[in-house]
Amino acid sequence: MSNSRENSVYLAKLAEQAERYEEMVENMKKVACSNDKLSVEERNLLSVAYKNIIGARRASWRIISSIEQKEESRGNTRQAALIKEYRKKIEDELSDICHDVLSVLEKHLIPAATTGESKVFYYKMKGDYYRYLAEFTVGEVCKEAADSSLEAYKAASDIAVAELPPTDPMRLGLALNFSVFYYEILDSPESACHLAKQVFDEAISELDSLSEESYKDSTLIMQLLRDNLTLWTSDAEYNQSAKEEAPAAAAASENEHPEPKESTTDTVKA
């Protein structure tokens, strides 16, 4: 490792400790754009850096969008107009971050990937950031982002099924986020539940073969898969019940459910 690369990695770790994630991104982007393969540690640092800056803005967008809906429902048009302008500012930041990550992935990281594990990691990341774009965009832009996300998740899944065991944390994390994509973006609870259950059942059947170092990561993601299955199943039952009783209650219930859980770390033991 060259001194400049070593320094960038060290500064990224320092920025993470200081919770200065924009600077963490800046340093890891230098490493990622070097056209050399990233180590497991380096790609995890890159993922964590971007996940933190995108995560904060996704949370902000959800909060602001919720307030906007409430103001509109109260007929407060002046406040709603101000909020809309503020929401657009957050969306511009989200868009810039997503396109920045996707550019690094498509120009540098995916072409340089040689192992099945690294390809799954980067295609999953590509699927994630196109999914984040699809969360707040509309019309043709949203459709294109959703199509690109689906394509990336499918590419990652094909490689994962061929090259990684069912209990592998990366394969499980991919399935977790792919199922969230089906539920949230494609509005397909059936596909989401089918994928989550299939992957969970396959992993359960091979749990005994898990190495000690992967056990904690794998079982944590399996728990998240099960939590989402429980959430989505109860949502479906509640919505069906609400629709049978009162259409207005059904409409309200569809907007009042907890966020499904995603894979928040991409750490894989070397």
UniProtKB/Swiss-Prot annotation:
Residues 240-270 are annotated as: Disordered. Keywords: Cell cycle, Cytoplasm, DNA damage, Phosphoprotein. GO terms for cellular component: cell division site; cell tip; chromosome, telomeric region; cytoplasm; cytosol; nucleus. Pfam families: 14-3-3 (PF00244). PROSITE patterns: 1433_1 (PS00796), 1433_2 (PS00797). Signal peptide: none annotated. Its main location: cytoplasm. GO terms for biological process: mitotic G2 DNA damage checkpoint signaling; pericentric heterochromatin formation; protein localization; signal transduction; subtelomeric heterochromatin formation. GO terms for molecular function: protein sequestering activity. The modification Phosphoserine is found at S234, S253. InterPro entries: 14-3-3 (IPR000308), 14-3-3_CS (IPR023409), 14-3-3_dom_sf (IPR036815), 14-3-3_domain (IPR023410). The keyword Cell cycle applies. Residues 254-270 have a biased composition (Basic and acidic residues). It is found in: Cytoplasm. The keyword Phosphoprotein applies. Transmembrane segments: none annotated. Belongs to the 14-3-3 family. Interacts with rad24. Interacts with byr2. Acts in cell cycle and stress checkpoint signaling by sequestering signal transducers regulated by the checkpoints. Required for the DNA damage checkpoint that ensures that DNA damage is repaired before mitosis is attempted. Sequesters byr2 in the cytoplasm to prevent its translocation to the plasma membrane. This is Checkpoint signal transducer rad25. The lineage of its organism: Eukaryota, Fungi, Dikarya, Ascomycota, Taphrinomycotina.
